[in-house]
Amino acid sequence: MQPTTEPHNAILVEKTPLETYVPPAKPSLIGLSRNELADRLGEIGVAPAQRKMRVQQLWHWMYFRGAQNFDEMTSISKGIRAELAQHFTVDRPEVVAEQISNDGTRKWLLRLPSGDNVEKAHEVECVYIPETDRGTLCVSSQVGCTLNCSFCHTGTQRLVRNLTAGEIVGQVMVARDRLNDWADREDGTRRVTNIVMMGMGEPLYNFDAVRDALLIVGDNEGIGISRRRITLSTSGVVPNIVRAGEEIGVMLAISLHAVRDELRNELVPLNRKYPIKELLQACRDYPGASNARRITFEYVMLKGVNDSLDDAKLLVKLLKGIHAKINLIPFNPWPGTAYECSDWDQIEKFSEYIFNAGYSSPVRTPRGRDILAACGQLKSETEKLSARERQTLRAMAMTD
């Protein structure tokens, strides 16, 4: 089924979020840089000569050991721990719902308090996808999204606000909490080995917070996920693509999904501001791109929309000269969508053509379909529940 094309003036680009972040009365230290932590220590009277050491201790306990309160930080003096507990927390987002798929995929709905007003608390999703050789965590960057991509469920949800660096890092910490994945894990392995910024929101429209969060996640003295195992996905915010390479230095993925501007204008309305030619030039200019650090182009397979062999041929032509791989994504249906997933035979033909042209073209294995694991679905479904049902979900998540 071919959806109706929106009028040209329906373009949705970067908008001011409806709300700004209101910190709790006792803010969390999660997401602060080392310099910011030193400033907070100064606020509670820690002498300048001690701050560097105390920052390193805090960093170790928060990001390497996963401490959930200051009492666990036994290498820090009791007096400083008491002052820290009086003024700050190391709280993560609250798990209000958890779903576990038959294939092992886990999806969490996380509550982000706004000040002391529980009624204004917002929720985001993150998803853990276990595979034989890795465990990938899909992380959100905004509450809702402004881009209105027609095939994406999050596009049906309004943009409420940007996440803070702490709320982004907090998703990784929640996953490690739930998976028992901190330094004291008996077998010494890690379940969360890869991070993808492919959850709710457009990361490059929340650049500073995403940058600060990913620098913390990639820090070798803490969470320690290599930057080569962190992928930032964008729908094509061209001015911030090269900047991301310079200031963050992680792997880049582009939500392409179409090879002609007319169709991409419909699927990804941001294309009307930054068309394909400009987007691909930014990819060619991305710092550090090489055969070993290829840019991933994501391409959702929509039946009768973008899955012809002519589309595959033009895709190969467009990507000439770019160190690239193409990730073909079978469409994950959601209630109310007008799209269907391409037939499997057609996906294989599309993939084979790209592969024969010299590009890696893996087909992403659909995961978590039994738990509505496509981005934004759990949030939408829980919003339909009554208050009593939501309280029951929260209790189950907390006691699981």
Curated annotation (Swiss-Prot):
EC identifiers of the protein: 2.1.1.192
Active-site residue numbers: 125, 375
InterPro entries: Aldolase_TIM, Elp3/MiaA/NifB-like_rSAM, Methyltransferase_A, RlmN_N, RNA_MTrfase_RlmN, rRNA_lsu_MTrfase_RlmN/Cfr, rSAM
Compartments reported by the entry: Cytoplasm
Cofactor binding note: Binds 1 [4Fe-4S] cluster. The cluster is coordinated with 3 cysteines and an exchangeable S-adenosyl-L-methionine.
Main location: cytoplasm
Keyword list, A-Z: 4Fe-4S, Cytoplasm, Disulfide bond, Iron, Iron-sulfur, Metal-binding, Methyltransferase, rRNA processing, S-adenosyl-L-methionine, Transferase, tRNA processing
Keyword match 4Fe-4S: yes
GO biological process terms held by the UniProt record: rRNA base methylation; tRNA methylation
SUPFAM superfamilies reported in the protein's UniProt record: Radical SAM enzymes
Disulphide bridges, residue numbers: 138-375
Superkingdom of source: Bacteria
MF GO annotations: 4 iron, 4 sulfur cluster binding; metal ion binding; rRNA (adenine(2503)-C2-)-methyltransferase activity; rRNA binding; tRNA (adenine(37)-C2)-methyltransferase activity; tRNA binding
Family: Belongs to the radical SAM superfamily. RlmN family.
Main function: Specifically methylates position 2 of adenine 2503 in 23S rRNA and position 2 of adenine 37 in tRNAs. m2A2503 modification seems to play a crucial role in the proofreading step occurring at the peptidyl transferase center and thus would serve to optimize ribosomal fidelity.
Protein name: Dual-specificity RNA methyltransferase RlmN
Species whose genome carries this gene: Bradyrhizobium diazoefficiens (strain JCM 10833 / BCRC 13528 / IAM 13628 / NBRC 14792 / USDA 110)
Lineage: Bacteria, Pseudomonadati, Pseudomonadota, Alphaproteobacteria, Hyphomicrobiales
